[in-house]
């Protein structure tokens, strides 16, 4: 089963992934972008080079295609639990050029069975961002991240409606333990 954790920077995805690693020891944990050796190179270029937004979108789509082919599909064939920090949902939300059609091509229509979406309000996001050193995306401000969050929600629910992906939307400001229990129960519902 393919499960993805989604949410804007600062909502606690990495914390939850760490807890899930302790709970689901036999699961394959991966990430997008950069879940393969080639993906790390593409991610580095996309985030650090002065390139057009369109070129950046295609680098991320290339990463997604390689990740699907070399990581996701083999693990699904082995019937493994796959837990990914981000997915095509982030790809569509963060890019102005990344459409569902292009992402379905890149993923060969391999979609997550379950989507966990961590959401946060403006004040909570401001507080979380004030506690960390900010990257290029986080430096664009809370309004930009809240716009991306709305796109994440829209894309996740569109995948639910069109393809039957299950979506669990959680308030990221709940306690780490409460969130972990809800996420683990959602995953275990089928495992």
Swiss-Prot record:
<dbReference type="Pfam" id="PF02223">
    <property type="entry name" value="Thymidylate_kin"/>
</dbReference>
<dbReference type="InterPro" id="IPR027417">
    <property type="entry name" value="P-loop_NTPase"/>
</dbReference>
<keyword id="KW-0808">Transferase</keyword>
<dbReference type="GO" id="GO:0004798">
    <property type="term" value="F:dTMP kinase activity"/>
</dbReference>
<dbReference type="GO" id="GO:0006227">
    <property type="term" value="P:dUDP biosynthetic process"/>
</dbReference>
<keyword id="KW-0547">Nucleotide-binding</keyword>
<dbReference type="GO" id="GO:0006233">
    <property type="term" value="P:dTDP biosynthetic process"/>
</dbReference>
<comment type="function">
    <text>Phosphorylation of dTMP to form dTDP in both de novo and salvage pathways of dTTP synthesis.</text>
</comment>
<dbReference type="GO" id="GO:0005829">
    <property type="term" value="C:cytosol"/>
</dbReference>
<dbReference type="GO" id="GO:0006235">
    <property type="term" value="P:dTTP biosynthetic process"/>
</dbReference>
<protein>
    <recommendedName>
        <fullName>Thymidylate kinase</fullName>
        <ecNumber>2.7.4.9</ecNumber>
    </recommendedName>
</protein>
<feature type="binding site">
    <location>
        <begin position="7"/>
        <end position="14"/>
    </location>
    <ligand>
        <name>ATP</name>
    </ligand>
</feature>
<keyword id="KW-0418">Kinase</keyword>
<dbReference type="InterPro" id="IPR018094">
    <property type="entry name" value="Thymidylate_kinase"/>
</dbReference>
<dbReference type="GO" id="GO:0005524">
    <property type="term" value="F:ATP binding"/>
</dbReference>
<keyword id="KW-0545">Nucleotide biosynthesis</keyword>
<keyword id="KW-0067">ATP-binding</keyword>
<dbReference type="InterPro" id="IPR018095">
    <property type="entry name" value="Thymidylate_kin_CS"/>
</dbReference>
<comment type="similarity">
    <text>Belongs to the thymidylate kinase family.</text>
</comment>
<dbReference type="InterPro" id="IPR039430">
    <property type="entry name" value="Thymidylate_kin-like_dom"/>
</dbReference>
